[in-house]
């Protein structure tokens, strides 16, 4: 830190983690400049990020400037959960079939690993786009195989528990199907 005048931190919403906090404190103790960047200015624990916000680029502005398209929302109404899961899966297949590029990938979000297996079976029964499952309880080899199928476009549907999380970079991920909590489909 003695040789550096500035510290630049990307993904700053993680900067409260003990290692980052200790690293930052060395710079702050020496009155060095710390600049933090994040597209997610919210911490998991609900506490605010430290420091002064000097620039905000809202999603609405990014959409207006053409970086993101507006979200197209489709909802599925059913009083029967099993039927709703099938209807959402069918809508995902419909959206993927309508994709002119043939490159879009869909994420089907569920709340538990048991639900992931159940919802995966629904997508598999529809017989399109070779769905795979990804969650933290999978063995590393199985998770890598599923990710490889997505990367190589052998699969275009991934069933996951909650969201895929930080570091999951797949620009072709355009469709989000929420099987738990909300029964909806968001297409970007």
Predicted regions and their residues:
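Conserved helicase ATPase core of P-loop NTP-dependent helicases/translocases
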Residues: 130-133, 138-162
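Conserved interdomain linker/interface between the two RecA-like ATPase lobes of SF2 helicase motors
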Residues: 53-116, 121, 127
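A short beta-strand-to-loop transition that corresponds to the Sensor-1 phosphate-sensing loop
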Residues: 37-41, 112, 161-163
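A short beta-strand element within the Helicase C-terminal
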Residues: 157-160, 164-181, 187
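Walker B catalytic acidic pair
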Residues: 10-11, 163
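Post-DEXD/H (motif II) to motif III coupling segment of the RecA-like Helicase ATP-binding lobe
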Residues: 6, 13-70
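Inter-Walker segment of RecA-like/P-loop motor cores
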Residues: 1-2
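Walker B beta-strand of ABC/ABC-like P-loop ATPase nucleotide-binding domains
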Residues: 7-9, 159
């Amino acid at each position: 830190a003695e040789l550096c005048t500035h510290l630049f931190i990307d993904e700053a919403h993680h900067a409260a983690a003990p290692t980052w906090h200790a690293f930052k404190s060395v710079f702050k103790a020496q009155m060095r400049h710390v600049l933090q960047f994040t597209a997610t200015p919210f911490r998991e624990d609900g506490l605010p990020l430290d420091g002064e916000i000097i620039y905000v680029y809202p999603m609405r502005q990014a959409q207006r400037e053409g970086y993101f398209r507006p979200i197209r929302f489709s909802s599925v109404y059913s009083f029967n959960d099993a039927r709703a899961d099938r209807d959402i899966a069918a809508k995902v297949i419909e959206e993927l079939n309508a994709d002119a590029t043939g490159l879009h990938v869909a994420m089907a979000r569920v709340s538990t690993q048991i639900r992931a297996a159940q919802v995966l079976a629904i997508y598999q029964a529809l017989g399109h786009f070779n769905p795979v499952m990804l969650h933290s309880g999978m063995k590393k080899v199985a998770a890598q195989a599923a990710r490889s199928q997505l990367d190589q476009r052998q699969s275009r549907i991934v069933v996951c528990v909650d969201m895929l999380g930080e570091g999951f970079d797949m620009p072709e991920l355009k469709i989000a199907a929420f099987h738990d909590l909300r029964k909806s489909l968001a297409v970007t």
